[in-house]
């Protein structure tokens, strides 16, 4: 039987509503400082939704020139930025690597939704002949991965997982398996999204999925008894994954290890989770079993925790079924909002930092945990505690469930 590779994390990058660099992101994560506020990117007055979690002060000039904004959608820019930050942290020199053994897997739930909106309006107003020739390459969902590969010269596998809000975690999990089974030495993996625009907000509002709160501090409140929907976020989170052998050979600083991955489907409903959380529980169990640990060894669960009534209740049942009361639970969406396909990437970074820094990020702005939530939820203040194993959950429309299990690195 072929020996399986261990898979380690050697770099990460993040673009998020609570920070675009590791120091700011970590500080806000520890302090429970949210990035939610009134929508600035367009006039949302007709949508009935006032709050979103937007990226602030994006340092475009660090890696891009002005023409890049015409040739790439915002979600691609976020993905490239996070990938380049992750590569820089990892210390990988692309000129010295066998780039045919370097792959990219970056998921997105919707891709260039803003471009689709703008070009449909342009076609309606001016006719088909005035549709931009850049429409298709800007709009298609795989171009975050494609643009990252183009930028760094990665010639291995390059894919984009599209599983709604599970996209980022699926991408990281599949990248983990790709290295584990020996197909790649290095993978750039994560998720990216940017659809805070009129059609994006209007569409999710029509589903009654969004919070209509006008109070930024009470809009995204996962597990709270008064939760009433999620807050749209945007950004990207990207990890550099390597085989342990490859990382050690080049003397890399190892930040953590991915030891398990689970992926299942509810096969229950287009947009609602299985109310018993059966599919999510199986995904957690798969990840823990692949990690070859007892469920009681999981110290922290970074929950999908969207702040919707249905998700939080079902997910808490899944956690209770698959794990034990030893696991602390929190949802960092109380800080970042819901990044859809980008959520899994950013939350993987948050989970890694929880392991590195030995703390549980808080679920912020909670007044009272819903009595029907049976999870051990950490609220309002970070908790310092040993974290050796943690899981990060992502659940998406279509019944998609993806879970990764991370382990603290001890040299």
Name these PLM-found stretches.
Residues 79-92, 141-145, 149-154, 158-193, ...:
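Active-site-proximal alpha-helical scaffold in enzymes
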Residues 11, 29, 83, 104, ...:
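Conserved small-residue
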Residues 23-28, 114-128, 178-181, 201-214, ...:
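A glycine- and small-aliphatic-rich helix-loop capping segment at beta-alpha/alpha-beta transitions
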Residues 9, 25, 33-163, 192-201, ...:
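Conserved beta-ketoacyl condensing-enzyme motif
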Residues 1-68, 90, 245-255, 349-363, ...:
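ACP-dependent fatty acid/polyketide chain-elongation machinery
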Residues 6-10, 33-37, 215-291, 300, ...:
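Condensing-enzyme catalytic core mediating Claisen C-C bond formation in acyl metabolism
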Residues 44-54, 111-115, 194-220, 262-282, ...:
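Active-site-adjacent elements of ketosynthase-type condensing enzymes
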Residues 125-132, 170-173, 177, 193-249, ...:
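Glycine-/small-residue-rich "gating" segment that lines the acyl/pantetheine channel
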């Amino acid at each position: 039987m072929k020996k399986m590779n261990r898979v380690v994390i050697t770099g990460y990058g993040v673009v998020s509503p609570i920070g675009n660099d590791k120091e700011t992101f970590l500080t806000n994560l520890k302090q429970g400082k949210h990035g939610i506020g009134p929508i600035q990117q367009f006039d949302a007055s007709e949508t009935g939704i006032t709050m979103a979690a937007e990226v602030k002060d994006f340092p475009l000039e660090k890696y891009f020139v002005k023409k890049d904004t015409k040739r790439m959608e915002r979600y691609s820019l976020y993905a490239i930025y996070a990938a380049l930050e992750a590569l820089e942290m990892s210390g990988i020199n692309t000129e010295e690597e066998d780039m045919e053994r370097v792959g990219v897997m970056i998921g997105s739930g919707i891709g260039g939704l803003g471009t689709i909106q703008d070009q449909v309006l342009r076609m309606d107003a001016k006719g088909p002949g005035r549709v931009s020739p850049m429409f298709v390459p800007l709009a298609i969902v795989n171009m975050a991965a494609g643009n990252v590969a183009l930028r760094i010269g990665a010639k291995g596998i390059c894919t984009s997982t599209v599983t709604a809000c599970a996209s980022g975690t699926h991408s990281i999990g599949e990248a983990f398996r790709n290295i584990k089974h020996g197909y790649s030495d290095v993978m750039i993996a994560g998720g990216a999204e940017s659809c805070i625009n009129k059609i994006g907000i209007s569409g999710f509002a029509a589903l009654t999925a969004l919070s209509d709160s006008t109070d930024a501090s009470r809009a995204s409140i996962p597990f709270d008894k008064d939760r009433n929907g999620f807050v749209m976020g945007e950004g990207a989170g990207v990890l550099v994954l390597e085989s342990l052998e490859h990382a050690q050979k080049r003397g890399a600083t190892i930040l953590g290890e991915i030891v398990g991955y689970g992926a299942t489907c509810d096969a229950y409903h287009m947009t609602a989770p299985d109310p018993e959380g059966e599919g999510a529980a199986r995904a957690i169990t798969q990840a823990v079993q692949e990690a070859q640990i007892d469920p009681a060894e999981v110290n922290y669960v970074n929950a999908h925790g969207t702040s919707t009534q249905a998700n939080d209740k079902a997910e808490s049942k899944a956690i209770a079924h698959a794990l034990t009361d030893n696991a602390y639970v929190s949802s960092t969406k109380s800080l970042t909002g819901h990044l859809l396909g980008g959520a899994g990437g950013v939350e993987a970074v948050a989970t890694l930092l929880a392991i590195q820094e030995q703390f549980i990020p808080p679920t912020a702005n909670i007044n009272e945990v819903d009595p029907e939530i049976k999870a051990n939820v950490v609220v309002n203040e970070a908790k310092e505690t040993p974290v050796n194993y943690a899981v990060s959950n992502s659940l998406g429309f279509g019944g998609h469930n993806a879970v990764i299990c991370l382990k603290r690195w001890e040299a």
